């Protein structure tokens, strides 16, 4: 399995494989030229990836991993689309509060063993659902490049990022209010395959939720009490990893 630290789906997949007794070789591609080369030789450009020989599957969807490995495992029960929207709203509101608490001098520093500025992590929390909404509104594929689009020059400070987050939160609400298929049963193209909108919405909710947990962890390590912690009840029903960070 190919992964890197701080990657939400990587941690979730590793925990999933371990929990179900699947032995695997762990290849951390972060700062590992040989590991990254092996990943590219498969034909993949992003992680997590589960591979057998030259065959591989992107592991953003555990259902895809189950099919690829031919595991006899029942998929988890998803929250309804409305419940996912409500959870996402809680997460975005919380992340906006946390971003405002990050000391200015820390924004360009990395967190733990991931060589990525904290400012980019904070931006990524909001970019995930923003990219989903853009893909839905423009009827285009949800690409890796769309999700990983970097922040513009105007997003430098805590307040810049927080206001950006507030804008994304409002955009999600506007999209959902006018989206005609409340069951989210239609199919959409993504960089990890073709899936129902319901499944991609679920990922667009739990993925930023996991990063919001990482922002709480960051504040804890700085000795700052997060402003209104996300609780287990707040996150109940989202298919999150057990841990907030994978070392």
Language-model features and meaning:
Residues 27-45, 69:
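Thioredoxin-like thiol-disulfide oxidoreductase module
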Residues 106-151, 189-247:
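Short, contiguous alpha-helical
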Residues 40-51, 60:
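Structural micro-motif
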Residues 71-84, 153, 160:
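Short, charged, low-complexity loops and linkers
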Residues 1-26:
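Local sequence-structure signature of Cys/Sec-based thiol-disulfide redox active-site neighborhoods
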Residues 78-102, 123-134:
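Alpha-helical bundle segments that constitute or directly flank the non-heme di-iron/ferroxidase center
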Residues 51-77:
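Non-catalytic, surface beta->alpha helical segment in thiol-disulfide oxidoreductase systems
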Residues 88-98, 153-191, 195-214:
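Acidic/histidine-rich alpha-helical segments that form the ligand environment
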């Amino acid at each position: 399995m190919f992964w890197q630290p701080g990657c939400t789906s990587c941690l979730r997949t590793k925990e999933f494989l371990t929990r179900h007794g699947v032995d695997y070789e762990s290849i951390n591609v972060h700062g590992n030229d040989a590991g990254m080369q092996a990943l590219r030789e498969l034909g993949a450009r992003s992680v997590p990836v589960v591979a057998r020989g030259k065959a591989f599957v992107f592991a953003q969807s555990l259902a895809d991993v189950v099919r690829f490995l031919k595991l006899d495992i029942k998929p988890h029960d998803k929250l309804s689309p409305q419940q996912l929207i409500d959870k996402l709203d809680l997460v975005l509101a919380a992340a906006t509060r946390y971003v405002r608490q990050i000391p200015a001098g820390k924004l360009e520093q990395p967190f733990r063993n991931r060589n990525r500025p904290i400012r980019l992590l904070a931006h990524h929390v909001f970019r995930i659902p923003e990219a989903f909404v853009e893909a839905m509104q423009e009827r285009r594929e949800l690409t890796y490049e769309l999700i990983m689009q970097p922040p513009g020059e105007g997003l430098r400070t805590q307040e810049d990022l927080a206001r950006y987050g507030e804008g994304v939160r409002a955009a999600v609400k506007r999209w959902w209010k006018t989206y005609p298929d409340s069951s989210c049963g239609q199919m959409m193209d993504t960089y990890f395959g073709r899936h129902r909108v319901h499944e991609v919405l679920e990922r667009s909710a739990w993925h930023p939720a996991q990063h919001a947990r990482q922002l709480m962890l960051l504040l804890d390590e700085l000795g700052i009490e997060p402003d209104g912690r996300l609780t287990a009840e707040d996150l109940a029903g989202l298919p999150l990893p057990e841990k907030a960070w994978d070392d």
